[in-house]
């Protein structure tokens, strides 16, 4: 009897997966702001939020056996910058990095053709184009063979947010990510990112 139940449950999962063969792509763009704080944080970073834009794609995988629950990984590119208003050093800094959110999302009906969703999951960020923070300025990485120095490019976060989708075509979403960075070598910074954007489903 137990074996039969196990087989029936497995069949239900498989049938559900087949029934939900649809997989949605989401091309999104929006505004993002990053704030830094912590004992090891520089005076510039602690007093200046880095603001900018992001753009990228997400892909949603459906599991119909668990109604409303989906897995939504993504690949986003962020560009953010800040400029000193006091004339101190550095006068201008910028960051560009790739972000890989790995969200679990729960979708629920709101009204008519509108749905809402909560999502949460880990986020991996990797700096690109040679920007590293060192001695109060961003420099090109010269220690390409030093694996520990390369870790300054990477930071981990945990994100959560809310999204609303209209007519299965347009999605508005907001998220907040909490994380730890080694942007400055041998120092630990807390970095939080607020993102608000629009996505087109296809």
Model-found features: residue ranges?
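Repeated loop/turn-to-beta-strand initiation elements of outer-membrane beta-barrel proteins
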Residues: 25, 67-69, 112, 164, ...
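Transmembrane beta-strands of outer-membrane beta-barrel pores
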Residues: 31-35, 61, 77-81, 99, ...
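Short loop/turn motifs that connect adjacent beta-strands in outer-membrane beta-barrel proteins
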Residues: 19-23, 63-69, 109-115
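Bacterial Sec-dependent N-terminal signal peptides
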Residues: 1-28, 198-202
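Flexible, solvent-exposed loop segments that connect beta-strands
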Residues: 36-47, 79-96, 128-152, 182-187, ...
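Residues that define the transmembrane beta-barrel architecture of outer-membrane proteins
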Residues: 23, 49-53, 94-100, 152-158, ...
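Outer-membrane beta-barrel "beta-signal"
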Residues: 164, 190-202
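Outer-membrane beta-barrel architecture
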Residues: 56-60, 101-105, 161, 197-199
């Amino acid at each position: 009897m137990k074996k039969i139940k196990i087989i029936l449950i497995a069949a239900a999962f498989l049938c559900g997966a087949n029934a939900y063969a649809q997989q949605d792509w989401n091309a999104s763009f929006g505004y993002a702001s990053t704030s830094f704080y912590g004992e090891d944080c520089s005076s510039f970073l602690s007093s200046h939020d880095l603001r900018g834009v992001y753009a990228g794609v997400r892909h949603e995988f459906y599991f119909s056996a668990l109604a409303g629950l989906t897995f939504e990984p993504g690949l986003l590119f962020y560009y953010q910058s800040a400029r000193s208003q006091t004339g101190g050093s550095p006068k201008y800094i910028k960051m560009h990095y790739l972000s890989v959110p790995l969200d679990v999302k729960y979708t629920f009906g709101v009204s008519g053709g509108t749905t809402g969703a909560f999502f949460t999951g880990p986020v991996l960020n990797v700096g690109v184009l040679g920007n590293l923070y060192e001695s109060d300025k961003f420099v090109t990485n010269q220690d390409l063979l030093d694996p520990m120095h390369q870790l300054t490019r990477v930071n981990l976060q945990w994100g959560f947010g809310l999204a609303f989708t209209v007519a299965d075509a347009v999605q508005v979403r907001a998220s907040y990510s909490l994380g730890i960075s080694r942007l400055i070598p041998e120092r630990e910074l807390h970095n939080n990112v607020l993102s608000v954007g629009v996505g087109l489903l296809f």
